[in-house]
A protein has these predicted regions:
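Catalytic core of Fe(II)/2-oxoglutarate
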Residues: 112-191
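Extracellular structured ligand-interaction cores
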Residues: 5-9, 71, 82-88, 95, ...
């Protein structure tokens, strides 16, 4: 068993099938646990609930550096480094991967607003080094409380992303140190 600070692939007892919503001209939309009752019921058997749910759409060529050169796409989900976890299901993953970064010594992240218009902390690529990467073609637990970004998008990609919370404290988050407890029967450890 090889522990991992950034991601775990999951072998789940079901297939996540959710119709891709109409995005219009947006790249991100919110939805609720009422939209995925079977998934929420399964999480409840693990002592978890959905705290927040998003769907993100990325188009080929993401990130488009012509558009994003004034905006950092490397970010954490939230305003502080806290190692909180999400579970992601990606449709049309293609060659896309999630990449995690560490700040170079003496460099800092800065307050920002994500593409989802939520508070985040971001960093410039030149201030970072790659720490880990993983293809997004399987259900996975991801540490979004560390700097990360999506790279190598070669087709329109949809990511259903769920921030989880303990069932007995639905306003809290679950943290990376807890995922191996909650998902012990479903994690596929890399050797």
């Amino acid at each position: 068993m090889k522990p991992n600070d950034y991601y775990y692939y999951l072998n789940l007892p079901f297939e996540f099938n959710k119709e891709v919503p109409d995005f219009g001209d947006k790249g991100h939309i919110l939805f609720s646990k009422q939209d995925v009752p079977k998934f929420e019921a399964w999480l409840n058997t693990l002592g978890l609930t959905i705290r927040h749910a998003d769907v993100f759409r990325k188009k080929p060529g993401w990130p488009d550096t012509r558009f994003y050169k004034e905006r950092a796409t490397i970010h954490i989900d939230g305003h502080k480094f806290d190692n909180h976890a999400k579970i992601n299901f990606v449709y049309n993953s293609g060659t896309s991967k999630i990449v995690w970064y560490k700040l170079k010594e003496g460099r800092e992240s800065f307050p920002d607003q994500s593409g989802a218009y939520t508070p985040s902390r971001s960093a410039w690529l030149e201030d970072c080094v790659v720490a880990e990467s993983a293809f997004t073609n399987r259900p996975m637990l991801v540490n979004v409380g560390q700097l990360h970004d999506i790279q190598d998008v070669d087709q329109i990609r949809y990511c259903f992303s769920f921030q989880l919370a303990p069932l007995n404290n639905p306003t809290d988050k679950i943290y990376w140190s807890d995922v191996t407890i909650y998902f012990k029967d479903y994690i596929e450890y890399q050797t």
